[in-house]
Design a protein with these regions (language model features):
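A short beta-loop-alpha structural element at the N-terminal edge
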Residues: 1-16
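Conserved GNAT-fold acetyl-CoA-binding loop/helix
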Residues: 2, 19-41, 50
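Short hydrophobic/aromatic beta-strand or adjacent loop that forms the aromatic wall/cage
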Residues: 49-50, 64, 137-141
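Conserved beta-strand in the GNAT
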Residues: 54, 60-69, 79, 84
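A conserved beta-turn-beta hairpin within the catalytic core of GNAT-like acetyltransferases
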Residues: 70-80, 90, 136-139
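Conserved hydrophobic beta-strand within the GNAT/NAT acetyltransferase core sheet
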Residues: 80, 114-118
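Conserved acetyl-CoA-binding loop-helix of GNAT-fold acetyltransferases
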Residues: 85, 91-104, 130
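Conserved active-site alpha-helix within GNAT-family acetyltransferase domains
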Residues: 96, 108, 112, 120-138, ...
């Protein structure tokens, strides 16, 4: 299997996967709707330096990863903005295959590192650790609700 660069004709599959993944256990996000997820996905794809891929499995798209490449003084960083695997395809190694293919693809593009954010209390945290990602101890995410 190979990653396929995201194109607009993949939108419906990505939207389906996103809504299914984020409204199913363990997340069960009731605030995720098809409408607001569609706007969110569109916004991400319009981000400067956007680079997204879809992962086909069994004749259909079963996962995607969206991000952007940031060029820093000391190298190029791919920031994962969203990643999801179709809940019907989870626990089959698709996420790990997706990450391995993404890492190879990004290396060939001259990207030096991948960064992402997740919550410590989600299965995704342990998935990323299992795949070699480490917590940056001195970094914190800050927010202020207005």
């Amino acid at each position: 299997m190979e990653l396929i660069m995201y194109k607009n004709n993949h939108f419906d599959d990505v939207l389906r996967i996103y809504v299914d993944a984020f409204t199913s256990p363990p997340l069960n996000y009731s605030f995720v709707t098809k409408q607001n997820a569609g706007r969110y996905i569109t916004d991400i794809t319009m981000t400067p330096c956007f680079l997204g891929y879809v992962f086909p499995s069994e004749e259909k798209i079963s996962a995607f990863v969206f991000g952007k490449i940031d060029n820093y003084f000391d190298g190029n960083l791919y920031e994962v903005m969203e990643l999801a695997v179709d809940p019907k395809a989870q626990r089959r190694g698709i996420g790990t295959k997706l990450m391995n293919l993404l890492e190879s693809k990004l290396k060939s593009l001259g990207v030096d590192a991948i960064s992402l954010n997740t919550s410590r209390n989600l299965p995704a945290f342990f998935f990323y650790q299992k795949n070699g990602y480490t917590e940056i101890k001195n970094n914190v995410n800050l927010a202020k609700w207005l």
